[in-house]
Amino acid sequence: MKNEKIKTNSGITIIEIVIGITLFVIIAGITIVSFNPAGQFARARNSEREMHLTALMIAVKQNIAESISGSFNCVSGPIPVSSAKMASASGSYNIAPCLVPNYISVLPYDPKAAGAHYAGVSDYDTGYFIAQTSSTTSTAITISAPSAELGQIISISR
């Protein structure tokens, strides 16, 4: 008997390549949709806003604690009773000279609010708002982040 060699083709066909690419695209699409990067970034920015508001509140409370009168000591006057933007522009509450550098090194600003920035005590816009409410029994200071994302309301009162 003769040894006959059977010839076999051992290559990858175009159909196998197309199936492999299709599976890769489907899995990648499902992964990207399930992670929702835009939502993850929005949640991260909201967490950053919460940290900013906490830092600002701590600085304000330290100012009050060190004040002889027990109230907020600021060249801009008392904290407004109606919500006011913390910024250096006219019509805003200029809080930076009262906090920087004694109570906080730099003012934090909203990561996505239009125009929010900090270039120094005389040029800033935090994108955050502050108000003080008083009753016969207590005084509360509220700092809020109106540019919060995902429908979340971010504010801190103490």
Predicted segments — roles?
Residues 12-22:
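N-terminal signal-anchor/signal peptide hydrophobic helix marking the start
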